[in-house]
């Protein structure tokens, strides 16, 4: 059984050095020893300023004060978090005993006689307020250069802040020169000899915080980036250099320049220039970050060999994924850049994507366990989709996890949560150990569970295990009936040290979920934890043992695992025997402190695999304290700086505390270093497992490799991650590699060099290449049209494919691929593809591919006009294609056939839905069309007005029983409709001159036939009392007569070519009368060529000619040759068989003259009466 040594033995040892031991008497806390400490903080942010220390004893005290607490108040150790007596407290240097040959320097000591100011961390270590000269301006002596060369040979990388010169013992009353202030506690001497005499150093190596962020950021006050007046070699301050000896050449002389022309001086200048460059880059906010992709080539080989995965996901998953991505573009991307809105939308959509894929993974039948539980990622029998989901989840959570309050969650918290959710080999272990009897501490995995809980960020679980351990029930050798392992004073000491350890862990910011590891809270916590560890070691190893001589003084943890470093020497065995705390508990508590203080070796020892080690290092690692021992891991340090941005969730926000070790740190850089440190250790990295390779790509920030691997498992997941990464700006934009100096190499030579200029990823970029492959698979995918999306709409594969292609980064490449899909779809269009055409048109317009939309609708309009009688639909699609000539052709077909048959065509029963709605509810229909395309609606409404007026004329004429008005009124209404059509046809030949720019609605080719229809409203020259079988009642008004007379005069004055076309169409109309000359003839026989070789109307369009031929010959259901037509009248009845155009004009002139004379007489009679 472990027993504490007798008090008499302990009392014979000399007491540790304290600033004022008498004032600490009576303290009951075993950790209230006030020995001054030399241990520096291990936090990345450096020494905390005075404003962080509140009212604690770390506030600056007067030089002569030996204690910062009252005589009546007992001193309290920093380990407990109350009051004074800390190893890092004030005044340690002046209160050291003479027996301490290696007295530690006080890191927080104030300058004598002065009150420290509350200044930022970087300035708290400076001793001068004025701007100091740059090291580039200092002259260099021969002796200095020789010393530097010797130092360079011993160690290539000099230790910052290491004093130079002979080591001297420091007397008790001698003023101490501050390590970080650059000034002594007494006024500095003026001579160089005196300065050398007063320069003191410690007898042992002194830990330092390293350079803080302010030493680079505040270039206004210090050019070199070093503290005080020291440089990298530890020279004296600038006042020494300014006192130049007579034999030393003046600064700037030739001899001075020659002295500087040495390798050592060149190396110093190079290091100085690099420091200045880094400081300048940080101040300018440079955005370049160097990456070291050690596994990029391996990942490329793997996903190239795996190829592209087939599209086998269920339709509902594909539709839901696309719906979320469309939501991302609709809500997050607007006409104006809004990083805040985009950042919020990215985070929300990322969570929804993960949940959607999780539901599908849960629905997949899981394979039976085959002993691969401890593998990283899904097992070898897992489905490809599950592997893709596992990798994509980490990538999305890494970049777009948000806290509950909407802010950016610190990345360590995100990774700890992901690790516990996705890679937890110890699920339920803490609860199992807490239920273990007789006590949790008796469990064989008790300490491992404590270490694992800390390593995984579960600080509360670790404290709960320690608090409820039940040390009083632990028996030796783990036997149930054996002797108790701890009793009496040993048990009391165990309980005390464990309670104090628990109190430290409870003060850890991670205990409350604060994982902003570069914040001031973490800085103060690690200062306190370091002090607590020192007190623990002093108490456990004996009061006469100084910290520097402690077995665990290095606190690197590199020499031990869980069982500790077995020192079998007599000194080691004696130290164990003298320990106040049982050695196994003491060793384990050291590991606990090593983990929370970020010791790399202890973290690696506690981890079970490289993934756990990577995330554990990322969350806890204090890199500066390991730099000297791990220089081989520092090759990947990035000197660039990535500018912060809201849409890049991982880049640190602009707090100066985030800049450490002469470098602008980011979480991604730290994650890459943690990963490289983990795989460089003894952990096995399975390069044959694509999932582990994908994890390596994520940790190295190689997003291209991640997407390439995802593409080998699931195209929907790969495409989604690529788009989110592109919008989130964590996928670098594609920059095609130049082929400079490679033009003369053939493909074999390029293959040897590893260059494939024709690879899709090299040509299009990994994002566009992935989207192209996904779109090609969607076009061939079957089954989507049977499932409704979230909006309740059926969507086909090609529709999703075009939507995906519209999100490519390259507009040219996107249009090229869309054109291929459109051409493929157009080849399969039929007259029943209306719904497909509407969807395709809508999508192409949303993607701003107007040209493709117009070509597609024009092609579909041709199909309708050629293979159907849906003339209204054909006109609408021509209008959508913005082809007014095509719209005019269809309208000319309808007008010509109506005039030839002298009736409305097509009949009301054969109207297609489009034409029916345009004729019956023209205003409302055009309003609906205008919502889709305003220009197309205007074009269709304008072109259709002439045909609508002509059809209205025939409807009024033929529907005798449909109206209740008198015959005279009906004839007047019919005349008004016909006159409007005649006026439109005459519009292009006003004054006998053809002017196509007037863009008349009705072609002038129909003017003679329209005038023939007007003969029924004009007095018969042969019998003025009869109007085509009706009483000679005036039908036309004077204005209408005027319109007809103008049309007659314009037609007679027009060119012969135009008149001949009109006359030939008139002959066609007369020949089409019942019993006319057209019987047995084809319409094409009547479409003769004019004298100029131009065909007359209808002949210019084979489409219209074929339609006219089919209709006239009764080749369709709309054929009027098989359906008797009931007309109100037919103007061709009673006309001579060989009637010409001149005859129509002559009859109109005579009839109109008589009607006009009758109107004048009636007007004159009205005036007389």
Curated annotation (Swiss-Prot):
Primary gene name: NUP85
Role this protein plays: Functions as a component of the nuclear pore complex (NPC). NPC components, collectively referred to as nucleoporins (NUPs), can play the role of both NPC structural components and of docking or interaction partners for transiently associated nuclear transport factors. NUP85 is involved in nuclear poly(A)+ RNA and pre-ribosome export, in GSP1 nuclear import, in NPC assembly and distribution, as well as in nuclear envelope organization.
Motif (Bipartite nuclear localization signal): 103-110, 155-162
Protein name: Nucleoporin NUP85
Membrane as UniProt keyword: yes
Species assigned in the record: Chaetomium thermophilum (strain DSM 1495 / CBS 144.50 / IMI 039719)
The keyword Transport is annotated on this UniProt entry: yes
Alphabetical keyword list: Membrane, mRNA transport, Nuclear pore complex, Nucleus, Protein transport, Translocation, Transport
One matching Pfam family: Nucleopor_Nup85
GO molecular function terms noted in the UniProt entry: structural constituent of nuclear pore
Basic and acidic residues compositional bias, start-end: 166-176
Region (Disordered): 1-210
Acidic residues: compositionally biased ranges: 143-152
UniProt xrefs under InterPro entries: Nucleoporin_Nup85
Biased composition (Basic residues): 156-165
One Gene Ontology term, aspect cellular component: nuclear pore outer ring
Single GO biological process annotation from the record: mRNA export from nucleus
Complex and partners: Component of the nuclear pore complex (NPC). NPC constitutes the exclusive means of nucleocytoplasmic transport. NPCs allow the passive diffusion of ions and small molecules and the active, nuclear transport receptor-mediated bidirectional transport of macromolecules such as proteins, RNAs, ribonucleoparticles (RNPs), and ribosomal subunits across the nuclear envelope. Due to its 8-fold rotational symmetry, all subunits are present with 8 copies or multiples thereof.
Low complexity: bias regions: 34-49, 95-110, 191-210
